[in-house]
Amino acid sequence: VERSRGLGDVYKRQLLLSAIISDTLMFRSPTCTPLDKSVAEALAVIAEVDIETYAKNMFQAGSNFSGKTTEEIFYQDFKIFHTDDCDFGVAQISAMSREELDKVAEQIRPFMVQVLAEKKIDMVYVMLTDILEESSKIIFDGENAGKILGAAFRKEERSEGILLEGIVSRKKQFIPTLMNEMAERQ
């Protein structure tokens, strides 16, 4: 925060605040540290914004999918992972409501088959993360993708997707659990 005081204008402080809020999903992600929260609170005071209102407006703007192509929505946060036996991709799409995410899921499902072929991966998962409910519905495609997901999170495999309550971080929650299950299958 001390370094941000020298930045000189509210815009730069709001930008730093936005980065922290986005990275920590409004402090709901397990990646959030006490330092993240204290720095964000200090930046909010300096930038003269109410942090809750600012975060809500920021996420609502970020989850406005109108005018975006399926490809733009899908690839805005997509990463490929490798194990000894397979390559798989995970996209994460966040919004403020399950309804928004359900609409996006309908749009994305047919595109996932194309992603498998274009990226030459075995499986693809999409985390549809509801920020306010602190949960992710996972939709998937590829051979054994649903079986692996269900086994990893001790959930029944469902073709329409699997709801994982409390799972919002791809890095700290989703990928380690999924990769552990894949390692057990080797």
Model-derived segments and their meaning:
Residues 19-20, 115:
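Amphipathic alpha-helical segments in well-ordered regions
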